[in-house]
């Protein structure tokens, strides 16, 4: 079979203006970036405000494995299948980070005959939104250190006289705002800044990947430009010598940060291989952030489409939980149906197999053991009240016996339906059966409910997520987390939502514990204030906000061929 990039190149793409026109976006609402992609102006929201809203389908998955479950493939395939059935459907997905693109995961455009094209443009830069987030984020870091430097070299009266501003008295040991870059770079996780004459004061800092920036979460959760400006102003960058928060508004940098991101707030329109619309916007990771594409993209799509397909990162314990408890609270739009993606490989891997050869070999015994993980995710999604459809993403090595057994087994659970999806190999045709079941699911009553209420304490919300969202026996706060909890409570931020940052490779905090872990205590190591985004991030176990490159990074395969074409992107 051809590679993803070869399939993308061999398919004739329609001009993005035609995709927009067919979807209902006028030329005055479009800012093209070449023929393949275009920004969509937010002015469209006013024009379509009276339109009826379409149905919203959220795609999630079982616990991720190194073999890939195909969540984006399924999301794009489902969108293609829905359109093939005569529904007006649109996909809304996140913008890929170049960290994973050049790391081990690869791109995030889907794959095979269910992908967003041109895939290389999606996976590399797109329309520059991630760079805008990086620049705005790092401006705040520079502003903090500049203020710290100038205040440290003169008296309070001298500073007030020369700057016209009151000193902020930033505590160098309480600077909460780190720097970001859109690459996997473990050596930058912890650094010391201010070294050398006239560069201080010296203090510890570090880099996170841009997808972990609170600004990325703000971009995804903002309702419009004014809302983004308001949220950026609430960013807590540091504490002063009395332990009081210093915000981006206080520092006077919020306006400039907003201006840098003013174009980034517009989603980007692209297309699938079959010419179906896809809105790409924002890129927060689901393990270290809230892991969903933007509310703005959803709002536009829902006013133009019958059905909108979006996805939450990683398994249902990660992106789906945050979709429900964070994104939905802000958007006010609850899901009409949820799709859980599974593969035979994933079930075998969650039974304890990690060999590629063993994974591809038929093994009913291993499937039965691994099925517990799928059932856990079905039950986890079901507790939120939306109808659940299981999509079996088929691989060439899957046997008829295994697939038949799995489909029958799923129908014994709380799932509304189950269907095999072959979007990767067949595109729209291979996803039509799944699309029919999903349409039926969206016509059922959805009795959505949150996992917790915002007026609960931070500890109560964490305990609920741990017990009901992961199956944990309880939580344990580290000494640092207990101090941070006191600070959060003293600032009156205890009514914010909670975003748990943990490994995606297990339902628990231990990446090597597969299947359905039980009788474990969730260790909360740190609590981070994300007042602009509207949540408190709880770091669990050994989770890192800056990934590192592996021994065989993806960049080794990427190059330019003799025809000046990009090769090696996966």
Swiss-Prot record:
Molecular functions per Gene Ontology: ATP binding; formate-tetrahydrofolate ligase activity
This protein's pathway: One-carbon metabolism; tetrahydrofolate interconversion
InterPro entries cross-referenced by the UniProt entry: Formate_THF_ligase (IPR000559), Formate_THF_ligase_CS (IPR020628), P-loop_NTPase (IPR027417)
Gene name per UniProt: fhs
Residues that hold ATP according to the record: 65-72
UniProt name for this protein: Formate--tetrahydrofolate ligase
Family indicated by similarity: Belongs to the formate--tetrahydrofolate ligase family.
NCBIfam families: PRK13505.1, PRK13506.1
Provenance organism: Shewanella sediminis (strain HAW-EB3)
């Amino acid at each position: 079979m051809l590679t993803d990039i070869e399939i993308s190149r061999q398919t004739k793409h329609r001009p993005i203006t035609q995709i927009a026109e067919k979807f209902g976006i006028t030329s005055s609402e479009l800012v093209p970036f070449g023929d393949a992609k275009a920004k969509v102006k937010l002015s469209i929201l006013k024009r379509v405000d009276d339109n009826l809203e379409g149905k919203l389908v959220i795609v999630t998955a079982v616990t991720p494995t190194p073999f890939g479950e195909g969540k984006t493939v399924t999301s794009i395939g489902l969108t293609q299948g829905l359109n093939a059935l005569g529904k007006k459907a649109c996909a809304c997905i996140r913008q890929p980070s170049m960290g994973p693109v050049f790391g081990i995961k690869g791109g995030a455009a889907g794959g095979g005959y269910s992908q967003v094209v041109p895939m290389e443009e999606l996976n590399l830069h797109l329309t520059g939104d991630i760079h805008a987030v990086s620049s705005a984020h790092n401006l705040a870091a520079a502003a903090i250190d500049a203020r710290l430097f100038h205040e440290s070299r003169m008296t309070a009266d001298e500073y007030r006289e020369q700057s016209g501003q009151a000193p902020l008295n930033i505590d160098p040991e309480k600077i909460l705002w780190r720097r970001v870059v859109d690459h996997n770079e473990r050596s930058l996780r912890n650094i010391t800044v201010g070294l050398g004459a006239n560069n201080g004061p010296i203090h510890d800092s570090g880099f996170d990947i841009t997808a972990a920036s609170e600004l990325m979460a703000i971009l995804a959760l903002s309702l419009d430009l004014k809302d983004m400006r308001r949220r950026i102003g609430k960013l807590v960058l540091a504490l002063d010598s009395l332990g009081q928060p210093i915000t981006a508004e206080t520092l006077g940098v919020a306006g400039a940060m907003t201006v840098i991101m003013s174009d980034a707030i517009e989603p980007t329109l692209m297309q699938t291989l079959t010419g179906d619309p896809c809105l790409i916007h924002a890129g927060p990771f689901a393990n270290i952030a809230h892991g969903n594409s933007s509310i703005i993209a959803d709002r536009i799509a829902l006013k133009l489409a019958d059905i909108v397909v979006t996805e939450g990162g990683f398994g249902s314990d990660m992106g789906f939980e945050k979709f429900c408890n964070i994104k939905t609270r802000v958007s006010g739009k609850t899901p009409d149906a949820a799709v859980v993606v599974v593969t035979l490989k994933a079930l075998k891997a969650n039974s304890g197999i990690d060999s590629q050869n063993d994974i591809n070999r038929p093994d009913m015994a291993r499937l039965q053991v691994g099925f517990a993980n799928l059932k856990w995710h079905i039950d986890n999604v079901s507790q939120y009240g939306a109808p659940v459809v299981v999509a079996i993403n088929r691989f060439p090595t899957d046997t008829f016996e295994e697939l038949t057994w799995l489909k029958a087994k799923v129908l014994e659970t709380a799932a509304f339906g189950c269907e095999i999806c072959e979007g990767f190999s067949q595109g729209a045709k291979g996803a039509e059966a799944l699309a029919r079941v999903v349409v039926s699911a969206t016509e059922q009553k959805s009795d959505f409910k949150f996992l917790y209420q915002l007026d609960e304490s931070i500890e109560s919300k964490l305990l609920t997520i741990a017990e009901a969202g992961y199956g944990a026996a309880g939580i344990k706060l580290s000494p640092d987390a207990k101090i941070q909890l006191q600070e959060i409570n003293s600032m009156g931020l205890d009514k914010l939502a909670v975003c748990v940052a943990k490994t995606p490779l297990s339902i628990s905090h231990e990446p090597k514990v597969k299947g359905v872990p039980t009788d474990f205590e969730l260790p909360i190591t740190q609590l981070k204030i994300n007042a602009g985004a509207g949540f408190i991030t709880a770091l669990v176990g050994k989770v890192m906000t800056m990934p590192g490159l592996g021994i065989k990074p993806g960049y080794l395969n990427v190059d330019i061929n003799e025809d000046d074409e990009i090769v090696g992107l996966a």
